[in-house]
């Protein structure tokens, strides 16, 4: 819901929506913040096809932002699916937390925050 839509909803309805959203949070132990991406790479061999533009790969990496730095971490093919599932869980939970935060902000505006 947008902030303008939240302003039109009763406090009781906001509290009920917040409870429903909080109940939808799942598997916090599977939290993995980042973006799964695929990149091709060049090797160090002089006569290799990658020197002509045919890169090796694609290989999967997890791009994370931590300690004010962006980093990419290689994700082996054996854990690619699990890594992707963890990232999806995190994205779903973050979307729910964002909406819960917006509801709490609206409740604060109305002086109804518990």
Describe the residue ranges of each PLM region.
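A positively charged, amphipathic N-terminal helix/segment that binds anionic biomolecules
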Residues: 1-114
